[in-house]
């Protein structure tokens, strides 16, 4: 099968404009006789709504529910998920799907009724998120970002060159093959090696050993790494060892960064929220971390229940007023890896995982190797918040400096999100239960 016509036409670009003189000089062969005019093809569908509106719909319909399920199932460890990265991978899968399979994927992604316009919305959101939000521009002084996404089929399949081009050109991802049937034990190493190369070593594994077997169909994968420097890091007071109180009543000694600054800050019933902006590079993007800190040491899960059960809760409780705040935040690193297949099924995405799935636009028309379906949807999130990221600087407090009006000490479990402010894309959601854990 071929890539759907509306995507194929979007990819097709003639090497020269019709009648270009340079084109005529490249060949001495006589010009072919004009053919009878073909029936005019309808133009490819345009997105049904502006990308910002489509992105907001996707975050409400897909990203928030997925993040809620992942974090609720994370157990007693730190966890983070980049739902937009998973969204990009599934949008890529939709680009290679047909019929009911495509409709179901698009509906799960929050892209309308799953028709051609919905497919254009999904492609538009995914393409802009990858190219505008997740692309690394750390050389200009902004945060370090590394995204890798792709789909892998068995080596026996004949991938459509048009779909391979679609994956790279539109979704910033890859469509590749690995030998699932004959060398399933080697396939994870092959895929992990590609992820490591694509992220320049910031993400070293995506597939754990034993993930692949001889019956594996398609594997979708996405990984995102983030590390930034706080804005105004020269205002840093000090880094000290302090206690962090865990949910089980124990405590751990970890490094805390302490400083005071005027920041967007809000006090709500039973929790506080602070916005910590990252240093901006020489582009329009602006990243910030928002920390939601419950008043009670064991209040995190009650808070996250509200966050994920009310679609507008986060937006309605973001801080809007600035305040001079004494800030104390622990260093932490999260490296969290998970197969989100079961969460997607719980969200109604079932057909793509059945042998009846139709991903025929991923392969050539002469591929007769049998059913093509999703086996796994793997995701990994890696982010670092530590003294290296903020470039610790020794600064004296100074006499006569005003005391902060509020204090924000994140010394017990909290929820956080990292948002790109210009587009409104929430690239990470997560929670910290024990900052001494480095996985």
From Swiss-Prot:
InterPro entries: Serpin_CS, Serpin_dom, Serpin_fam, Serpin_sf, Serpin_sf_1, Serpin_sf_2. One of its GO terms (molecular function) is serine-type endopeptidase inhibitor activity. SMART domains: SERPIN (SM00093). Residues 12-44 are annotated as: Disordered. One of its GO terms (cellular component) is extracellular space. It holds the Pfam family Serpin. Signal peptide: none annotated. It comes from the Eukaryota. The record marks 403-404 as: Reactive bond. Residues 31-44 have a biased composition (Pro residues). Residues 389-413 are annotated as: RCL. The reactive center loop (RCL) extends out from the body of the protein and directs binding to the target protease. The protease cleaves the serpin at the reactive site within the RCL, establishing a covalent linkage between the carboxyl group of the serpin reactive site and the serine hydroxyl of the protease. The resulting inactive serpin-protease complex is highly stable. Belongs to the serpin family. This is Probable non-inhibitory serpin-Z9.
């Amino acid at each position: 099968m071929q890539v759907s016509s509306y995507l194929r036409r979007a990819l097709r670009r003639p090497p020269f404009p019709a009648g270009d003189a340079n084109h005529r000089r490249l060949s001495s062969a006589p010009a072919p006789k004009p053919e009878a005019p073909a029936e005019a093809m309808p133009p490819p569908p345009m997105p049904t709504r502006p990308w910002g509106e489509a992105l907001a719909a996707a975050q409400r319909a897909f990203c928030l529910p997925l993040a809620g399920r992942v974090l609720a199932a994370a157990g007693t460890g730190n966890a983070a998920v980049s739902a937009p990265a998973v969204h990009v991978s599934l949008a890529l899968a939709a680009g290679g799907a047909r019929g009911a399979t495509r409709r179901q994927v698009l509906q799960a992604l929050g892209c309308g009724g799953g028709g051609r316009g919905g497919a254009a919305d999904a492609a538009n959101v995914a393409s802009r998120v990858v190219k505008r939000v997740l692309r690394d521009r750390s050389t200009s002084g902004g945060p370090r970002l590394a995204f890798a996404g792709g789909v892998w089929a068995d080596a026996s399949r004949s991938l459509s060159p048009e779909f391979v081009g679609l994956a790279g050109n539109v979704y910033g991802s890859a469509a590749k093959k690995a030998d699932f049937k004959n060398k399933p034990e080697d396939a994870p190493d092959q895929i992990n090696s590609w992820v490591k190369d694509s992220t320049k070593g910031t993400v070293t594994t995506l597939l754990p050993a034993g993930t692949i077997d001889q019956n594996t169909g398609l594997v979708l994968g996405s990984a995102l790494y983030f590390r930034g420097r706080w804005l105004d890091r020269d205002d840093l007071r000090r880094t000290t060892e302090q206690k962090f109180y865990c949910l089980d009543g124990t405590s751990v000694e970890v490094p805390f960064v302490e400083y005071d600054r005027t920041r967007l800050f809000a006090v709500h019933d039973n929790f506080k929220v602070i916005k910590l902006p990252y240093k901006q590079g020489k582009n329009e993007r602006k990243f910030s971390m928002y920390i939601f800190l419950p008043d009670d040491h064991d209040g995190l899960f009650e808070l996250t229940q509200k966050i994920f059960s009310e679609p507008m809760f986060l937006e309605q409780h973001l801080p809007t007023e600035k305040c001079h705040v004494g800030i104390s935040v622990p260093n932490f690193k999260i490296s969290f890896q998970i197969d989100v297949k079961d969460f997607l099924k719980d969200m109604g995405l079932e057909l793509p995982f059945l042998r009846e799935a139709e991903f025929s636009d991923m392969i050539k028309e002469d591929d007769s190797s049998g059913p093509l379906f999703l086996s796994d949807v793997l995701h990994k999130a890696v982010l670092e918040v530590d003294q290296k990221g903020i470039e610790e600087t020794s600064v004296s407090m100074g006499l006569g400096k005003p005391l902060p009006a509020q204090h924000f000490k994140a010394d017990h479990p909290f929820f956080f999100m990292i948002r790109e402010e210009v587009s409104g894309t929430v690239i990470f959601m997560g929670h910290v239960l024990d900052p001494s854990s480095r996985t």
